Amino acid sequence: MQGPAPALVVENLWKRYDGKPAVEGISLEVRRGEVFGLIGPNGAGKTTTLKIVVGLLKPDHGRVLVDGHDILANPYEYKSSIGYLPEATTLPDYLSGVEFLTFVGRLREMPRDVLHARMSDLFRRLDLEAPRRDLIVTYSKGMRQKLAFAASVIHTPQLLILDEPLIGVDPAGQHSIKEEVRDVTRRGGSVVVSTHMLDTAEKLCDRLAVMHRGAIAAMGSLADLRGAARTGEDATLEDVFLRLTEEAAVPAPTEPPKRRFLFPRGR
């Protein structure tokens, strides 16, 4: 008997900007109940990959399945089950924290009592209770990041996509965010997190993919990555990362199939 579909499947994803490759032949699978890390140097293609997964970018080729559904064919069917925190967030300065999360919750069509209970819990856990009625323009960078994170999880998503979620957040706030991430997986959901904080990724993620120059250099548990990098058993994720992202680490991928386009080409 076949088990449930993986939370997320990415198949042979390609994306170019002005003819320059950003993502080349990416394939990965995220299991239910796991935290999957996406790490790589600047410009490796992590953010582009995540934007395609959440439907903000269209790939040149490839397929993305969420709970077995092709999101390119059904772009709205899956979105209620996904939470997304982009790398760069823009929040409405002249709303309060309460007003902003209320707005997000209503967009998500959350029942009023459920929304209010969830907001109270998130404000408490993220240490935003005191400033919750202050205008966002008065928030520090770390407070804004925590509020944006709260917006991404307000509806208790089954698939949470996080792009550099801990930037500018103090240690206590980082701990709270990581606890909420673990709560998602305890509920049977899945999390994909892109981060440059390798020590955090090593402790938080069940499996990881190392991206380099638009391709995946290695993927698996830390033990798997150590094997791919041919390092010792005591090697840290940083040691493995540096070895795998050396210039010769990733072979040039083959070109995507010719004359097969998901979207019409301009005349």
Over which residues does each language-model region extend?
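ABC ATPase "signature
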Residues: M219-G220
